[in-house]
């Protein structure tokens, strides 16, 4: 205890000497330092707590702003998101539909859970318009080669082409999606595309027929059938490669039957367009060539009439 008191007294003397040398210096005790440090620590800690709470509140506010209510399916806002694509995305999906190969899933590699209706809508509209126009141009070119052919514009082909293409691009995917959804209940491991993804796959698969229809203007029958077969093979292969990951876990009979029906319906569409819009001309469009009518035996020809002589 004596040693401690001597040390304290010695420190007090040193402090007194320092004060004597610098009387204007400010003095603070150790307790004041500790109190101020504790106060600073409390203030800093409370500031950090308030900052963290503020950041959490900001995050919650941003999440609430991001989670906007989804529009109803009967409103235009609901379908607006399906047309929100740029040119590069549409071109990439068209390229994917033109170059199918095994192991390349169109939905997984090109749609990426973002199906669009912009591409299928305009592809169907373009195909219907090109079918009607080229069907009429075929008659015009035939009339130029053979003047005996009578041509009249067939505007009803525009309506028929539009109804056929749009019904196929929407009703067939609807039936296919419904069947796969029904089979999903019996086979729990089966994956399933959404209805809009199925429509998108069918819409882009029809793009290959647009240049094919233009090439059908070449007036060579075997070449037209060759172009049609190539287009059908590319388009049907894209559908089969895309649907195979969905149906492969089903029974072999169901998978084979479903893919066969898909290819058959695709072939019927191509065959129907070829035979209807590029069919041979009916007989009422061919004007028969004028034929020479033999003169009646009772009619005297001018050369056989002899002038009368007068006496």
Swiss-Prot record:
The name this protein goes by in its record: Protein YIPF2
Gene: Yipf2
A GO cellular component annotation in the UniProt record: Golgi trans cisterna
Keywords for the protein's UniProt record, in alphabetical order: Acetylation, Endosome, Golgi apparatus, Membrane, Transmembrane, Transmembrane helix
GO molecular function terms noted in the UniProt entry: small GTPase binding
Cell membrane recorded as keyword: no
Assembly and interaction partners: Interacts with YIPF6; this interaction may stabilize YIPF2. May also form a ternary complex with YIPF1 and YIPF6.
Topology, Cytoplasmic side: 2-120, 181-198, 248-252
Subcellular location: Golgi apparatus, cis-Golgi network membrane; Golgi apparatus, trans-Golgi network membrane; Late endosome membrane
Organism per entry: Rattus norvegicus (Rat)
Pfam families: Yip1
């Amino acid at each position: 205890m004596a040693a401690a008191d001597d040390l304290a007294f010695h420190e007090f003397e040193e402090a007194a000497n320092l004060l004597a040398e610098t009387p204007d210096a400010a003095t603070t005790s150790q307790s004041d330092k500790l109190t101020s440090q504790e106060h600073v620590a409390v203030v800093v800690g409370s500031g950090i707590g308030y900052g963290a709470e503020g950041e959490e509140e900001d995050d919650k506010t941003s999440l609430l702003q991001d989670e906007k209510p989804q529009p109803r399916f009967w409103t235009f806002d609901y379908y607006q998101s399906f047309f929100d694509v740029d040119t590069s995305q549409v071109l990439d999906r068209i390229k994917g539909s033109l170059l199918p190969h095994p192991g390349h899933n169109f939905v997984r590699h090109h749609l990426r859970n973002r199906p669009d209706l912009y591409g299928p809508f305009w592809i169907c509209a373009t195909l219907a318009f090109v079918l009607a126009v080229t069907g009429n141009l075929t008659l015009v070119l035939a009339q130029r080669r053979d003047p005996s052919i009578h041509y009249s514009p067939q505007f009803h082909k525009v309506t028929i082409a539009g109804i056929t293409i749009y019904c196929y691009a929407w009703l067939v995917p609807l039936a296919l999606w419904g069947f796969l959804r029904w089979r999903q209940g019996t086979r729990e491991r089966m994956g399933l595309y959404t209805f809009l993804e199925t429509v998108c796959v069918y819409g882009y698969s029809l793009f290959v027929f647009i240049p094919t229809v233009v090439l059908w203007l070449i007036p060579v029958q075997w070449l037209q059938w060759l172009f049609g077969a190539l287009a059908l093979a590319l388009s049907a292969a894209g559908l089969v490669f895309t649907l195979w990951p969905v149906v492969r876990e089903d029974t072999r009979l169901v998978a084979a039957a479903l893919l066969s029906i898909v290819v058959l319906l695709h072939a019927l569409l191509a065959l129907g367009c070829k035979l209807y819009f590029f069919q041979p001309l009916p007989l009422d469009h061919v004007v028969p060539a004028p034929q020479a009518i033999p003169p009646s035996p009772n009619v005297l020809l001018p050369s056989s009439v002899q002038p009368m002589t007068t006496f």
